[in-house]
Amino acid sequence: MTGGVAGKAQALAAAISHPGDVLVNLSGGKDSTATWMHLEQSGFLQAKREQGWRVVFAFADTGWELPETYAYLEKLEKLVGKIHRVATWVPGEGEAPPSGYDLLVPQWATAGKCLPADRAALARRLEARLGRPYSPLVRLMVAWANVPTTQRRWCTEDTKMKPLVGLLATLNNPINVIGVRAGESADRAAQPVWEWSEAHDAFVWRPIHDWTVEQVIELHRASGVDPNPLYLQGSGSGRVGCAPCVYASKADLRWLVQHQRLRLEILGEIEEEIGKLNGRSPRWFSLRKVVEDSDGARVAAVPVPVSQAAEWAQTQRGGRQLGLFLPEEAPGCVAWGMCQR
């Protein structure tokens, strides 16, 4: 890649003028769906097709989404066409690759390693509890005898980024289209609309970077494309994706208690099983409980298991009072104007 602003501009112009592949990432979330609709309705994708470009849609499967998201992606595929499923591949001994994926990127297999029989059996049991034929995140947790945390959030890199980078490596002169908005976080606000990514070996384009959430909702409404149904249930912080994320808010946790309690029960089982493997007490959430000595002096603050985090999510007054009658939050359908449908 030629250095400097001029070099980037020159390479960008070349990338756009020479036919290649446009990779549009779809997650089942509102922003990536809005990105596809925007590019389709603006005529960008059709123009690229006419110029000889290939448009590729892809979903990086963490194996940690809720069933509603997987069902929504199948529905979305009827509108956009083929969605390539990519994932990190962590095999058990003698285990055949799972069906339903277009690309599996080796993780442990790169070193010729496989999960031993007992750990592979544990992974399959947890996958069955999730209702998934294969879960990259579960496989990596079992393989490494650890869970991701806010301090060591390896989940994004190992279950989303690496498979997508593997897919990009198979494409020709790709432009990687990502549906993120500046309003989501300070980190995303600092990202440019266009950039060259050494990690991706491709240009990255964020077409709706300056959009508001209201614009995203309005595009869905105007296009007649329903959002992921999880948004209409409220979905805690208003975002869908890994459930739960290690960065889950109190609202996210409370929503899971109310709507997806089984997922929290399974996460509790995962904490317990991983604890048996590593001899410690791994905790998914960063919530801590103060431990005091007999004199009432603070001794330590220890992470709590998911069951206690779920109890805390239903409290008020800083966790001091159980909220038997928590104030009702406006349902997600209010923001989407779809409560009467």
Describe each PLM feature range:
Residues 115, 156, 243-246, 334, ...:
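Secreted/luminal cysteine- and crosslink-motif detector
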